[in-house]
Design a protein with these regions (language model features):
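N-terminal targeting signals for export/organelle localization
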Residues: 1-47, 156-158, 185-187
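A short beta-strand-turn-helix
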Residues: 45-64
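Short pre-active-site segment immediately N-terminal to redox-active cysteine/selenocysteine motifs
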Residues: 63-65, 69-73, 141
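Conserved helix-turn-beta segment immediately C-terminal to the redox Cys motif
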Residues: 63-64, 81-102, 117
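Conserved redox-active cysteine motifs that mediate thiol-disulfide chemistry
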Residues: 69-86
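Thiol-based oxidoreductase modules, predominantly thioredoxin-like and allied folds used
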Residues: 95-109, 121-130
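Short, internal strand/loop/helix patches
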Residues: 115-150
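Thiol-/selenol-based redox modules, centered on thioredoxin-like
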Residues: 147-187
Length: 187
């Protein structure tokens, strides 16, 4: 009698299939399970670059918050920052805030401070050198943007940045602000 080995998990095809399955599992795990639309963002403590601390819920008490995970080595992160700073200033009267959470190592703190100083950004800078917040909010792919409304509800999530996407980012901000403005007009 001849034994026939199932070819499904053997050889190159098996390796490719196993890799594909692993990627699907990893993607589903990393795909923002704590920050899916309409979920409440966890109230995580954030250490700010200026040495003070705050929480995500404190930052959303007065208005919406856009969280962005970034690193000094991330070119797309640096490109989107100028737009996020512009939106931070443009919509400040509506209590909109931007929190840029840096994930560089503790050794890079001086580099982070120098970069922010040189750019004269006005948004809040959080530090997450051990990537605790990034892992909890599934922000390990950079940049990851998470837009949260005044109540702490995640309204939009986006990973990556290419030129032109700043238009979509601002549209999402306007949508969340429109809801908050309508709530103010009712009261």
């Amino acid at each position: 009698m001849i034994k026939v080995k199932p070819l499904l998990f053997h050889g190159l095809f098996g390796l490719v299939l196993k890799s594909y399955i692993a990627l699907i599992i990893a993607f589903n795990f990393m795909n923002g399970k704590d920050t899916v639309s309409e979920s409440i963002i966890p109230d995580l403590k954030v250490k700010l670059l200026n040495g003070s601390s705050t929480t995500l819920h404190q930052l959303t008490q007065d208005g919406p918050l856009l969280i962005d995970f970034w690193a000094t080595w991330c070119v797309p992160c640096k490109k989107v920052m100028k737009f996020l700073d512009e939106y931070h200033e443009k919509y400040a009267k509506e209590n909109f805030k931007v929190l840029m959470i840096n994930t560089d190592t503790p050794r890079s703190l001086a580099k982070v401070k120098s970069f922010i100083r040189s750019q004269k950004y006005s948004f809040n800078i959080g530090m997450d050198p051990n990537k605790v917040i990034a892992k909890k909010l599934n922000g390990m792919i950079m940049p990851t943007l998470i837009l949260v409304d005044k109540g702490g509800v995640v309204k939009w999530r986006h990973q990556g940045y290419v030129a032109g996407e700043e238009i979509e980012i601002e549209e999402q901000i306007k949508q969340v602000l429109g809801k908050n403005i309508n709530e103010k007009n009712k009261g």
